[in-house]
Amino acid sequence: MPAPFEKGSEKKGATLFKTRCLQCHTVEAGGPHKVGPNLHGVFGRKSGLAEGYSYTDANKRKGVEWSEQTMSDYLENPKKYIPGTKMAFGGLKKAKDRNDLITYLASATK
C-alpha cells in the first residue's frame, strides 16, 4: 500500500520536475503537449482526458480522478498503476520525492 500523501517542499518539487518530468511535460496554461500531456488543470480531471493529447486505451479506461493521493500512487510505479501506459518514467520510489513533486504540481498546474 503506497504511503499517504503529505504536503512536501514546493521548491524541491520544482527541482524534481525540471530534472525528471520537464523533458516530456509542461504545466502552464496553454502549454504544448510534448511526449507526455500538458499537466495544467490535471488535479480533479480524469485520466486520459487532456484535450488534444493522444492517450493509450489503458489511460482512457483507467478513469481515475487525479488527486494528490492518486497522483502519488501513480508516480510510485506508473506501469503498475496503469498497465499499458506509454509513460516511460520508472517512478519515484521515495514518498518524500513524490510529496515534494505533487506539492509543486498542485501549485504550478492551477
Swiss-Prot record:
<keyword id="KW-0496">Mitochondrion</keyword>
<keyword id="KW-0479">Metal-binding</keyword>
<keyword id="KW-0488">Methylation</keyword>
<dbReference type="GO" id="GO:0005758">
    <property type="term" value="C:mitochondrial intermembrane space"/>
</dbReference>
<keyword id="KW-0813">Transport</keyword>
<dbReference type="Pfam" id="PF00034">
    <property type="entry name" value="Cytochrom_C"/>
</dbReference>
<dbReference type="GO" id="GO:0046872">
    <property type="term" value="F:metal ion binding"/>
</dbReference>
<feature type="binding site" description="axial binding residue">
    <location>
        <position position="25"/>
    </location>
    <ligand>
        <name>heme c</name>
    </ligand>
</feature>
<feature type="binding site" description="covalent">
    <location>
        <position position="24"/>
    </location>
    <ligand>
        <name>heme c</name>
    </ligand>
</feature>
<keyword id="KW-0249">Electron transport</keyword>
<dbReference type="InterPro" id="IPR002327">
    <property type="entry name" value="Cyt_c_1A/1B"/>
</dbReference>
<comment type="function">
    <text>Electron carrier protein. The oxidized form of the cytochrome c heme group can accept an electron from the heme group of the cytochrome c1 subunit of cytochrome reductase. Cytochrome c then transfers this electron to the cytochrome oxidase complex, the final protein carrier in the mitochondrial electron-transport chain.</text>
</comment>
<keyword id="KW-0349">Heme</keyword>
<protein>
    <recommendedName>
        <fullName>Cytochrome c</fullName>
    </recommendedName>
</protein>
<dbReference type="InterPro" id="IPR009056">
    <property type="entry name" value="Cyt_c-like_dom"/>
</dbReference>
<keyword id="KW-0679">Respiratory chain</keyword>
<feature type="modified residue" description="N6,N6,N6-trimethyllysine">
    <location>
        <position position="79"/>
    </location>
</feature>
<comment type="similarity">
    <text>Belongs to the cytochrome c family.</text>
</comment>
<feature type="binding site" description="covalent">
    <location>
        <position position="21"/>
    </location>
    <ligand>
        <name>heme c</name>
    </ligand>
</feature>
<dbReference type="GO" id="GO:0020037">
    <property type="term" value="F:heme binding"/>
</dbReference>
<dbReference type="InterPro" id="IPR036909">
    <property type="entry name" value="Cyt_c-like_dom_sf"/>
</dbReference>
<dbReference type="GO" id="GO:0009055">
    <property type="term" value="F:electron transfer activity"/>
</dbReference>
<feature type="binding site" description="axial binding residue">
    <location>
        <position position="87"/>
    </location>
    <ligand>
        <name>heme c</name>
    </ligand>
</feature>
<keyword id="KW-0408">Iron</keyword>
